[in-house]
Amino acid sequence: MSSSRKQARLDAKTNIESLSVQPYPNSNKVYIEGSRPDIRVPMREISLADSLVGGTKESPIFEPNEPIQVYDTSGVYTDPSYDIDVYRGLPKLRQEWIEERNDTELLDGVSSVYSQERLADETLDELRYGNLPTIRRAKQGQCVTQLHYARQGIITPEMEYIAIRENMGRQKFADEQLNHQHPGHSFGANLPKEITPEFVRKEVAEGRAIIPSNINHPEAEPMIIGRNFLIKVNANIGNSSVSSSIEEEVEKLVWSTRWGGDTVMDLSTGRNIHETREWILRNSPVPIGTVPMYQALEKVNGVAENLNWEVMRDTLIEQAEQGVDYFTIHAGLLLRYVPMTAKRVTGIVSRGGSIIAKWCLAHHQESFLYTHFREICEICAKYDVALSLGDGLRPGSVADANDEAQFAELRTLGELTKVAWEYDVQVIIEGPGHVPMHMIKENMDEQLKHCHEAPFYTLGPLTTDIAPGYDHITSGIGAAMIGWYGCAMLCYVTPKEHLGLPNKDDVKTGLITYKLAAHAGDLAKGHPGAQIRDNALSKARFEFRWEDQFNLSLDPITAREYHDETLPQESGKVAHFCSMCGPKFCSMKISQEVREYAKDSEQVALDQAIEIKMIDDPLEGMRQKSEEFKASGSELYHPAVEAE
């Protein structure tokens, strides 16, 4: 290991061992209680300064602003009352709810052969997570999925928790200005004014939404993925054969949840995948997804042709018993679809897809994921693992977008969705990829048509291929669009996409970009209450409440840093201008003065006041600049002054 890699691992180890509560600036962790004391839904409440509404300089009159509550994925990592210890893990929020249902049993030990081998290997003791929980599984003849309960008409505590969470406390806002919202265009989505537990149950029962909630991951705070709810964002983490350690991945997990990751996928392909995943699960307040194929491939030394159902089955059980909430399974890639990719510019770009394609060609038969799909569903139903049906034939370039191979696989995913629903297994559908803007809506339309409104989960899509290093932007454009059209969850893309494994800063950049895309999609759909935060920030901006502007933003730290680059003094935080326009040309300052002028003069209408004000201030500034230009000799360019 290089010295830089050793240092990175040491730094990460130090960080996770000394994790302390790091709340956002001017924010408090608040909990909204449900119908029972153990339903306590976390929110981040942003406190705001008072607004100056009148009076004099000596005796100003202020009006209070209500604090704004926003969706919070950070778990106890931003709760000052909780003593964080990654070696102990997070509180088991859902354990009592799971026990009350009385449809699970505790196992004496792990069932997976591979898990048994890892536990017996004493050389792994230093890496192993020390506080392993007792494993649960459905009792014989029982199904323990949220879809099963929903279809039985049962509103679970998870469903009530989600209803409270999705409403984000907006019912308490009486301010007309904050509640103002433009009507959106939802493209057929059903967006109620208020999310109720019954609405959550119904959406899950119909297959339009999922609650990823493995019974062996009770630490996860319940959340929902569906187009009639807030658009969610997934963050990918995971080691590779050449980079990253357990400590770094746990650090990235905590970092991801802090910056808004609604779910996290562990895509580890390097050493000690089993141990890394255990550490992640025990410390994750959000659902964790995986691609089991990656670990199965490691078990056969990276030779795709040597994969088989027995190895895959053992891997699924291993991960389900650890607590993985959803599996990406590339079961829709059929043998006859592989030749359809022959004329593509970039062929098959999905790792899982390429593995399956190679196996199908080597054995000249359908993959074991397809032929054993019903057995996969039986395993998932015992632990409530949701299936994320992978798009192994997604386009890897805009040239390959919406081709025959992509849509052939999509139709098969729709067929498999119906099979999974026979077992009450929750399903989401994965989508592209690289798609130019004018071809994005067709993807959403085809998915809704062929996959029976199961939630769509896309990687971007990237709208152009010319910007390596900026693919968080090329994909953020497509993500906002497809989110508006009905996509339920967006998988983030970092600046390192196509270039390397992302570090902490890349993870943050990717998440902020995608939280922005998701929010833009919610606004465009007309999701109830989505505009409250925008309205609060706009009001703060107009009133020059700089600290409130920073704190209401998706990234308060960066917003404050950019402002302070040019106005670092504390006086800059109360100034009625920024460094872009200065005090004389600030449009908002002029607008405020216009309003005051019109209010003070009963004879002058607002439109007349604007004309008068435009003469009073900006034109005087223009005249001053004109005189300066003439005094300098009226020359456009002047010779550089050489230093003496």
UniProtKB/Swiss-Prot annotation:
A GO CC annotation given for this chain: cytosol
Cofactor binding comment, as recorded: Binds 1 [4Fe-4S] cluster per subunit. The cluster is coordinated with 3 cysteines and an exchangeable S-adenosyl-L-methionine.
Origin: domain of life: Bacteria
EC class name: lyase
KW Transport (keyword) present: no
Residues reported to bind Zn(2+): 434, 498
Family statement drawn from the similarity comment of this UniProt entry: Belongs to the ThiC family.
Oligomeric form and interacting partners: Homodimer.
Name by which UniProt lists this protein: Phosphomethylpyrimidine synthase
Organism field: Aliivibrio fischeri (strain MJ11)
